[in-house]
Amino acid sequence: MVDAKQRLLSAAVDYVAEHGVGERSLRQIAAGLGTSHRMLIYHFGSKEGLLVEIIRTVEARQREVLADLAHEPGESAGDMARRFWRRISDPALWPNVRLFFEVYGQALQGRPGTTHLLDDVVHAWLDPVIALGIAQGLSEEDARVMARLGLAVTRGLLLDLLATGDREAVDAAMEQYIVSYEAQLPGRTSPLS
């Protein structure tokens, strides 16, 4: 059974995906969810607390997508990465991506209520991506380095896409990264050599 907090959080994720957050107050968000701001404060502590939980939920869902893609039989590492990129760079997710970067920036500046986002914003991704790299044949050391690089490239290109809207150039950059990643896998030769 899903508790009230989980129902509110799920509704908030959907609300942000459809409407974004922008300058909406906690009262406005609550009204959009059909609840009171007091209920949101009770469950999440503050507007910032709610936004951090929305981000964590969206990020967890994205990691689930990655895990599901990793279990596709016969699919190359590059094909899996391309499908994941298409999924997370889908314009339907842009409100969530904008929220991620907004709150991430606030957390880096030390804004109260947001700093606990920093606890797992990188590390929650590393272990599953490292495991994926090892499964694809990388050494643990190489998988660790490539996981961090892949996370940085992906987030950087998402930011580029939001800032410029240049889908063609951003997709070309991601394709180049994927090709260079595949070249690191055992049994592959570098297309750059």
How should each PLM-predicted stretch be described?
Residues 56-62:
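Short, basic, alpha-helical segments at the C-terminal edge of helix-turn-helix-like DNA-binding modules
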Residues 7, 11-18, 64-68, 99, ...:
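Solvent-exposed, amphipathic alpha-helical segments
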Residues 73-76, 109-112, 122-147, 182-193:
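Hydrophobic alpha-helical bundle segments that form small-molecule/ligand-binding pockets
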Residues 53, 66-97, 146-150:
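Hydrophobic alpha-helical connector segments
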Residues 1-4:
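Short, Lys/Arg-enriched anionic-surface-contact patches
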Residues 77-79, 92-112, 116-119:
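Amphipathic alpha-helical segments used for helix-helix packing
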Residues 96-104, 127, 140-161, 172-180:
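Hydrophobic alpha-helical segments that form the core
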Residues 7, 11-49, 53:
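Helix-turn-helix
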